[in-house]
């Protein structure tokens, strides 16, 4: 009975939707607090001093999540979906004469490979299916065999399955081979540690689109 009472008290602390709409329990930025909705009523000028200061603070706070060594990096906010961000990273960091090793174990790794086709850049795909993570030893073997590979894309958490891939293990293999690490941490950054000093990646992308309103 005590537990039921505690649960009842906790439930009462959750404010009901202000406008009477139902709770939405599906994934994505759907149910938001009234305070967030109120904040969105204000129009911001992109060059207003207050908006620029807020953006500067946000960038600094995101960089701090990278841990020691974050001073050598910059945070570049861009608009668009998560796939848009991944495409921007691949198109910017993999040169036209480079080659990317895409590590896939789900829909988003495969989508990155398709993006490389659209970009007209060389790539090699290691497809582990939907249930197995790529491992450092098999990545090391591919890099030893294929000298043309310049970059390796690691999916931190494969969103379609929820599999958390062994980023540090793979990054160790890539760095040992003298190649460069790119990370898609779309559904993990901010929830799972990803220290740059430990993985030595050259670029990482993430997004709040899965948990917050667009462009927040």
Please place each PLM-identified region on the residue numbering.
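A glycine-/small-polar-enriched, mobile loop at the entrance of the PLP active site in fold-type I
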Residues: 21-78, 83
């Amino acid at each position: 009975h005590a537990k039921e009472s505690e649960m009842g008290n906790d439930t009462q602390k959750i404010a009901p939707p202000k406008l009477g709409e139902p709770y939405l329990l599906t994934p994505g930025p759907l149910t938001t607090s009234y305070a967030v909705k109120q904040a969105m009523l204000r129009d911001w000028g992109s060059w207003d001093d207050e908006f620029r200061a807020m953006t500067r603070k946000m960038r600094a706070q995101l960089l701090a999540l990278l841990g020691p060594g974050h001073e050598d990096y910059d945070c570049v906010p861009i608009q668009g979906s998560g796939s848009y961000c991944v495409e921007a990273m691949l198109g910017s960091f993999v040169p036209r004469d480079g080659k990317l090793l895409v590590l896939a174990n789900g829909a988003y790794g495969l989508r990155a490979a398709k993006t490389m086709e659209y970009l007209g850049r060389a790539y090699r795909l290691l497809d582990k299916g939907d249930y197995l993570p790529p491992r450092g030893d098999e990545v090391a073997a591919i890099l030893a065999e294929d000298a043309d590979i310049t970059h390796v894309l690691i999916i931190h958490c494969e969103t379609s399955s929820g599999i958390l891939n062994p980023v540090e293990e793979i990054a160790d293999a890539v760095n040992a081979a003298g190649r460069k690490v790119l990370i898609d941490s779309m559904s993990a950054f901010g929830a799972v540690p990803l220290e740059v000093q430990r993985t030595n990646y050259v670029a990482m992308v993430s997004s709040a689109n899965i948990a917050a309103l667009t462009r927040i």
